[in-house]
Amino acid sequence: MSQPAKVLLLYAHPESQDSVANRVLLKPAIQHNNVTVHDLYARYPDFFIDTPYEQALLREHDVIVFQHPLYTYSCPALLKEWLDRVLSRGLASGPGGNQLVGKYWRSVITTGEPESAYRYDALNRYPMSDVLRPFELTAAMCRMHWMPPIIVYWARRQSPQTLASHAKAYGEWLANPVSAGGY
C-alpha cells in the first residue's frame, strides 16, 4: 500500500479564535499524519516571514492547501505577503524556478455571504471561479496542478451539522488528496 501524499496546510486567519467554521475544518486535518498544519498568523505575528524555511516546507510536501477566509475578494494580508515573498523567482518561476512543478494547489475558502451572491447578476457581480482566478494563475505560474477549491459559503451562518459534514468530507479528502474524485 502506498503512502498518502504529504500535505502542507497553510492556514491564514487573522482572527482564528472567532472563526467557528475554520476551527471545525481544521479538526480533521490535525488528525492525519500526512498533514502538516502551518498557522501563518501564529508563526508570523510581526509579518516577518522566514522565506528559506517556508520554501523548504514547500519542497517537502506534495499538496499545498491554502485555507483562509475570503477577504475583499482575496486572502488575508499575511497570506498575500507570504505568496509574494515565498513564491519567488528561483523557486516558483524564472531560472531554476521549477521546484514546485507537478505539486498540487487547493484553496479552501470560507465566505461571509451565500453562494447566490457570487453570480454575474448578484451582489458580487462575479462567480467564485472568477474571484479565485488570481490564485489559479499563481498555481499556473508555479506549474502546479490547480485542484477545484473547497468553498464553505456563508460560513458563520452554517449549522453545526452542516459544518461537521464539510469537515468530515474535508478530512476524508486529506487522507488521500490526489485520488480520483475527492471532495
Swiss-Prot record:
GO BP, one annotated term: potassium ion transport
Membrane in keyword set: yes
Record-linked Gene3D superfamilies: 3.40.50.360
Localisation per UniProt entry: Cell inner membrane
GO CC entries: plasma membrane
Membrane topology, record value: Peripheral membrane protein
Superkingdom of this protein's organism: Bacteria
Keywords, ordered alphabetically: Cell inner membrane, Cell membrane, Membrane, NAD, Oxidoreductase
A GO term for molecular function: NADPH dehydrogenase (quinone) activity
Enzyme class, spelled out: oxidoreductase
KW Cell membrane (keyword) present: yes
Catalytic activity field: a quinone + NADH + H(+) = a quinol + NAD(+); a quinone + NADPH + H(+) = a quinol + NADP(+)
InterPro entries hit by this protein: Flavodoxin_fold, Flavoprotein-like_sf, K_H_efflux_KefG, KefG/KefF
Signal peptide: none
EC number(s) stated in the UniProt entry for this protein: 1.6.5.2
Function: Regulatory subunit of a potassium efflux system that confers protection against electrophiles. Required for full activity of KefB.
Family: Belongs to the NAD(P)H dehydrogenase (quinone) family. KefG subfamily.
Subunit structure of this chain's protein: Interacts with KefB.
Annotated protein name in UniProt: Glutathione-regulated potassium-efflux system ancillary protein KefG
Annotated source species: Salmonella gallinarum (strain 287/91 / NCTC 13346)
